[in-house]
From Swiss-Prot:
Keywords of this entry: Isomerase, tRNA processing
First-tier enzyme category under EC: isomerase
GO biological process terms held by the UniProt record: mRNA pseudouridine synthesis; tRNA pseudouridine synthesis
Record-given protein name: tRNA pseudouridine synthase B
Gene that encodes it: truB
Organism lineage: Bacteria, Bacillati, Bacillota, Bacilli, Lactobacillales
Catalysis performed (reactions): uridine(55) in tRNA = pseudouridine(55) in tRNA
Length: 294
């Protein structure tokens, strides 16, 4: 059995499920999953768990993400991104400066509440929102709280001849954040219709785009029996606090016993040497093995 983490660079035009399906065929391994869905049009880091590493998926999914994208001010779309139909157009504000944009972006830092876009996979009454949208039906959408730790402009404002304004941005956010909704809400705060015109995920669960492999690159390596794209299982807990345990504590964990450890973190990745051996969960004043990996 193959075990490990793959830092996959998902390309545009495929779903996250498509990527997993292709890897199952390529590696001839059924036990494969991904750690955080990417929309079909979005490129970037898609953490993949193989074999025993699939037990780490929930922690990879919960980890923070970093995205780089582009906002277009001047019109909104049905999907809140460039793939949708134009809903409304508006003139740019009389005063639109980089200082104003930067100042407005800072108002989104910290915990904010979002309304998921209609074209999303969020379920309401057992149906996905995009199913309602395609049927022309409206439904009340559940609001959700997310955390934005970074939201900054990364390019000058680019004013076009047809009355639009575009600029690039970078955002670091919690699980469940809709970046296209963030782009729309930013436009609303600036008093103008807007949408997200480009997006890529540049980091997720400690994995970065610079070291990611495309499916084509992985296929080429597999054909040469080269497996260096497969990372150790430890990469699956990169975002969890780390606790190194001794031999006695290792024995206690192997029997499922609780430990008293100097930490207040709700979850710990327990390491013995360089190997992760368990995920520990705080219960009262002790840590109980939640997942034992030895």
């Amino acid at each position: 059995m193959i075990n490990g983490i793959i830092n996959l660079k998902k390309e545009a035009g495929m779903t996250s499920h498509d990527a997993v399906f292709k890897l199952r065929k390529l590696l001839q391994e059924k036990k494969i999953g991904h750690g955080g869905t990417l929309d079909p049009d979005v490129v970037g880091v898609l953490p993949i768990a193989v074999g025993k590493a699939t037990r780490m998926i929930e922690y990879m999914t919960e980890a923070g993400k970093v995205y780089e994208g582009q906002v277009t001010l001047g019109y909104s779309t049905t999907t809140e991104d460039a793939s949708g139909e134009v809903v409304a157009r508006s003139s740019l504000p009389a005063v639109l400066t980089e200082e104003l944009v930067d100042q407005t972006m800072t108002t989104f830092l910290g915990k904010i509440t979002q309304t998921p876009p209609m074209y999303s996979a969020v379920k309401v009454n057992g149906r996905k929102l995009y199913e309602y949208a395609r049927a022309g039906e409206s439904v009340e959408r559940p609001r959700r709280e997310v955390t934005i730790s970074l939201f900054e402009r990364t390019s000058p404002l680019n004013f076009t001849e047809d009355g639009l304004c575009r600029f690039s941005f970078k955002v670091a956010c919690s699980k469940g954040t809709y970046v296209r909704t963030l782009a729309v809400d930013l436009g609303r705060a600036l008093g103008v219709e807007s949408h997200m015109s480009f997006l890529q995920r540049s980091a997720s669960a400690g994995l970065t785009l610079e070291t990611a492999y495309t499916l084509g690159e992985i296929a080429d390596m597999v054909s040469k029996q080269e497996m260096s794209f497969l990372l150790p299982i430890e990469y699956g807990v990169a975002d969890l606090p780390k606790m190194v345990i001794d031999d006695t504590e290792l024995t206690e964990i192997s029997f499922g016993r609780r430990l008293s450890l100097p930490s207040q973190e709700p979850l710990l990745a327990a390491f013995h040497g360089e190997k992760v051996i368990a995920i520990l969960e705080k219960r009262d004043q002790e840590y109980k093995p939640k997942k034992v990996l030895i």
